[in-house]
Structure formats: C-alpha cells, structure tokens
Amino acid sequence: MALSGILSKRVIAHRADENELEDDFSSSEELNTLGSEDDEDEDEDEDEGEGEGDESENEEAPDNASSEDDGDNDIKSSLSQISFGALAKAQQSLGPLKKGAKRKHGSEEEEEEDNKNTKYKKSKSDALNELRERIRRAKEEKASKSEGSRDNELLDKKHKEARSSKHAPAVQSSKYAVSRRRVVVDGENVAQVKSRDPRFDSAVQSYSHNAKSSSYATSHSDLAAAKNYAFLNEYRDAELKELEEKLRRSKKDDEKARLKKMITSMKDRKRAMENRERERQVLAKHRKKERELIKEGKKEKAWFLKKADLKKEALKEKYESMGAKERQKGIERRRKKVASKEKKEMPRSRRMVEG
C-alpha cells in the first residue's frame, strides 16, 4: 500500500504520454527476453561443467559470478530508465495489495512520516503555547499599567481638590508643561449664542423700554408683538373648536385620550395668556392712577404693587367681570384647588385624622 501511494504521488507530479508508456513496455519485454537468454546460457554452462572435472568448475565459478553481477547491473539500469507512468500502469494491472501484506520498506517510510508529523505537531503546539504565554504576559502588563495610571489619576484629583477653600485659586503641578494657548474664558460657563428674531427683539424695536423697572413688567416689544399677531388668537379658537368636534366624533379610546390632552393643553395656554393680559391691564391702571395722584400733589412718591397684590387685584377683576352663576362655579373651583394644595402640604398623620 505504501509503494502504491508513493507511485500515485509521483504519477500525479509527472504524467507521461501514451507513446512513452508503449516504449517502456517494449523495453521491459526486452529485459525479460534478455533475462531468459542469460538463464539458458547459465544452464548450458552448468551441463558442460558437469562433464568436466573439479578444476573446470573452479575456473568457471568466478566467470558465473561476474556474469550474474553484469545481469543485475543491466536490470537496475533498465529499471532506472522506466518512467513512473509505466510503473503506475503496472501497479494498476497487478491490483492493490492486501491489508496484511505490507512491505517492510513502506512501513519504515510510514513510520518516518508519522515521526515527522508528530514532531511538526509538537513544534507547532509548542509555538502556540509560547505565543499564548506571551499574549497573557502582555495583557497582565497592560492591566497593571492601566491600574497604576488610574491610581495616579485619582491621587492627582485628590491633590487638586484639596484646597484651603472653594474661593482659593486652583493649584497646578510644576511637573506638567504649561499650555501655549491661554484660556481666557471657560467654555462650560459661557452661555451659547442663541439666534434672535428681530420681530420679538427689544433691541430692534423703534422704541426702548426699561424692563428691569419691575420683575413682572411686560416690555413694549411683547405688547407690540401681541398687537401685530392678534389674528393668531382667532386661529387658535378655530383649531380648538375643530379638535372638540373630532373628540365628539371619535370612537377609539387612544384617539380620544390624545385629543383630550391636546384640548386641555390649548385651553391652559389660552387661560394663561388671558391672566397675563389681565395682570397687565391692572398694572397699567395702577400706574396711571399713581401718576395722576402725583400730578395733583396728593402723593410725593409712587406706590408699586407687589406680585401678590397684583395677583389679588387681577383675580378680583376676573370675578367682577363674571356673571352670578359663573362666579359661584369659579369660587367653588378655586376653593377646592386651595384645599387640595393645603392637604398635600399637610403631614400625613394630620391628613388622615382630618380626612
């Protein structure tokens, strides 16, 4: 089996033409005929030797040995000239060897190949193990370095944070190089520049107003914008009616919840705008009244409303403009709102007793 394997490998590497195969077979036949002629000559010599004496046998013995050596050399030379294709063809014609009939030479070659393979595998496994060991060591060194750097960073942070007071200047180690670019303003504490709309910007308006005179005062730019875009209130009212109509016609719960949320948001926004407008009117009336009193000489200095007083006056103005029934409903709603707010601020133990 080993010989057949070796022959097949060599046949794959060196394929011969059909003409070479025929020539090789003819040469092998000639060798066979030569071998048969040599055998006949040897038989004739033996017969002649039997008729002669012992002296002739001693003389012909070296001649026979030399002839046999010449024949062996001729066979070896002829076999060396036979191509691998002819040998493969002969092996195929003879058929494969049986399992138990292994040649000694083939078994030795297989053992050598097995030994080489095992040595190669061992060397490969050793190289892999060595590579894995190097990778493991490199990882350990990297982890130790990272841990050391983290410890150093923590120590540096602690050293930086340790100051006499929060107003003390920051301390920087002299080991670190100073940056060539000087930080004038810290970017984190600087407010980002926002885009400005000239329609609502007081700096672009044709008149100026000191909005810092009171914290709740409304600037003239806001008033001008409200006056210029008053038609948006009509659009909002139309949109609110449309949403209420959709809510009345809708049947899906998800759609109803979404529409209710939108309607509530729009109503709250509208109510907040009305309250702001009412407070502005109350504040304008109060300023006008104080200005007239100063002109008449009844007052030397103007009296400015506080936020709480302004809200009370605005609420009073709101209830005075309502009807009787609407005023009663509003007062009841206000009372419930204040009661729930007080209940939330009350401790839980008192809340349970009074509830």
From Swiss-Prot:
Instruction: Please list where the region (Disordered) is annotated.
Output: 1-178, 193-217, 263-284, 319-355
Q: Where is the composition biased (Acidic residues)?
A: 36-72
- Does Transcription regulation appear among the keywords? no
- Bias (Polar residues): 203-217
Where is the protein localized? Nucleus, Nucleolus
Q: Name one Pfam family in it.
A: RRP36
Entry's Gene Ontology cellular component terms: 90S preribosome; nucleolus
Q: What is its main location?
A: nucleus
Which controlled-vocabulary keywords does the entry list?
A: Coiled coil, Nucleus, Ribonucleoprotein, Ribosome biogenesis, rRNA processing
Coiled coil ranges (UniProt) are: 111-150, 233-325
Q: GO annotations under biological process? A: maturation of SSU-rRNA from tricistronic rRNA transcript (SSU-rRNA, 5.8S rRNA, LSU-rRNA)
Q: Basic and acidic residues compositional bias: what residue ranges?
A: 123-164, 271-282, 319-331, 339-355
**Protein function:** Component of the 90S pre-ribosome involved in the maturation of rRNAs. Required for early cleavages of the pre-RNAs in the 40S ribosomal subunit maturation pathway.
Name the PANTHER family for this protein. Answer: RIBOSOMAL RNA PROCESSING PROTEIN 36 HOMOLOG
Q: What's the subunit arrangement here? A: Associates with 90S and pre-40S pre-ribosomal particles.
The family line of this record is: Belongs to the RRP36 family.
Name of the protein in its database record = rRNA biogenesis protein RRP36
Species per Swiss-Prot/TrEMBL record = Trichophyton verrucosum (strain HKI 0517)
The lineage is: Eukaryota, Fungi, Dikarya, Ascomycota, Pezizomycotina
